[in-house]
Design a protein with these regions (language model features):
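A general structural motif
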Residues: 66-85, 102-110, 129-137
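Short acidic, glycine/serine/threonine-rich loops at helix termini
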Residues: 2-12, 111-113, 138-139, 162-166
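Peripheral docking tails and interdomain loops at the edges
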Residues: 150-192
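Solvent-exposed alpha-helices and their adjacent loops that cap or buttress functional pockets
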Residues: 91-94, 143-145, 178-179
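Redox- and metal-dependent alpha/beta enzyme cores, enriched for Fe-S-associated oxidoreductases
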Residues: 94-122, 135-142
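Short beta->alpha junction loops
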Residues: 128-133, 187-191
Length: 192
């Protein structure tokens, strides 16, 4: 609701500041190749299941390279506009024992809660997810305070029949594979 119905002040980035970061010829070529009702074309109808499977697996290399590309452009945006975007951003006490992990519109509210609680001496923090897919466990663990004892993951989706919602499962897997089984992990949902 907040992202679709709320009126909020925003800072608009000047196109001139960002245009040098984008190859507009590549954008035009991409758009020319996109599906268009004025120039209809069929795609994907010429593969059997075995070939389709191979093509889906071949895409993995592109997905694996994506985080480095995103970080490169985040650094350019940060330098140009004075922002501080990373794959994951941490906000809160350096020695936090309780941390929220979330993405999207809830982060603004969570920051206010973190400010309120840290002012009262509580050791709390927030990990903001900026790039969700592909999930980069190493980058997540890098920003998670070493002092954390409890993590609450806030999802904004419902996966019927699943053991947990997507962000929760990614955090759970990351903590488990890093040997951080002693951290108490809780999942929650703040909307759909």
């Amino acid at each position: 609701f907040r992202t679709s119905h709320e009126i909020q002040k925003i800072e608009k980035w000047d196109y001139a500041d960002l245009k040098e970061m984008c190859n507009m010829d590549a954008v035009a070529a991409f758009r020319a190749h996109a599906l268009n009702p004025e120039h209809p074309a069929m795609r994907g109808s010429h593969e059997n299941g075995d070939v389709f499977f191979q093509h889906r697996e071949a895409c993995n290399t592109a997905y694996n390279e994506l985080p480095a590309i995103v970080e490169k452009y985040m650094a350019k945006v940060n330098e140009k506009l004075g922002t501080n975007y990373d794959l994951f951003n941490y906000y809160g006490a350096e020695d936090a024992e309780r941390v929220i992990v979330a993405m999207g519109s809830v982060n603004d509210v969570a920051e206010e809660v973190i400010d309120y609680l840290t002012a009262k001496g509580e050791k709390v923090g927030l990990v903001k997810v900026r790039l969700y897919r592909p999930w980069v466990s190493e980058a997540f663990l890098k920003v998670l305070p070493k002092t954390v004892k409890k993590v609450a993951v806030l999802d904004r989706t419902k996966e019927p029949g699943a053991l947990g919602d997507p962000l929760y499962l990614d955090v759970a897997t990351t903590l488990r594979e890093a040997g951080l089984d002693t951290i108490v992990l809780t999942g929650g949902r703040y909307g759909l």
